[in-house]
Amino acid sequence: MQVLVRDNNVDQALRALKKKMQREGIFREMKMRGHYEKPSEKRAREKAEAVRRARKLARKRAQREGLVSGRPAAAR
């Protein structure tokens, strides 16, 4: 990964690098590789992530169709 440093502005270059790494998912992968994850734990995590994605998609779809308001339930 490469970031240009313009006018010796290292802080701006570091922010750009961090943003690129965040977008690529490098921080998340480093966290996951920090310790061994058993295959059963990996399956459970991936299944939970899939359920979370499906719920989010259903919520967005319902919101688009006007069935649910965009505000969270606690704010009502």
From Swiss-Prot:
Basic and acidic residues bias: start-end ranges: 35-52
Give GO BP annotations, semicolon-separated. Answer: translation
Q: Where is the composition biased (Basic residues)?
A: 53-62
Pfam families per UniProt:
Ribosomal_S21
One cellular component (GO) term of this entry: ribonucleoprotein complex
Q: Which organism is it from?
A: Chelativorans sp. (strain BNC1)
* Identification of the protein by name: Small ribosomal subunit protein bS21A
Q: Where is this region: Disordered?
A: 35-76
User: PANTHER family from the xrefs?
Assistant: MITOCHONDRIAL 28S RIBOSOMAL PROTEIN S21, SMALL RIBOSOMAL SUBUNIT PROTEIN BS21M
Question: Taxonomically, what lineage is the organism?
Answer: Bacteria, Pseudomonadati, Pseudomonadota, Alphaproteobacteria, Hyphomicrobiales
Gene3D superfamilies with a match to the protein in the record: Ribosomal protein S8
* A single MF term (Gene Ontology): structural constituent of ribosome
Q: What's in the keyword line of the UniProt record?
A: Ribonucleoprotein, Ribosomal protein
Q: Which gene produces this protein? A: rpsU1
> Which HAMAP family does this one have?
Ribosomal_bS21
State the family it belongs to: Belongs to the bacterial ribosomal protein bS21 family.
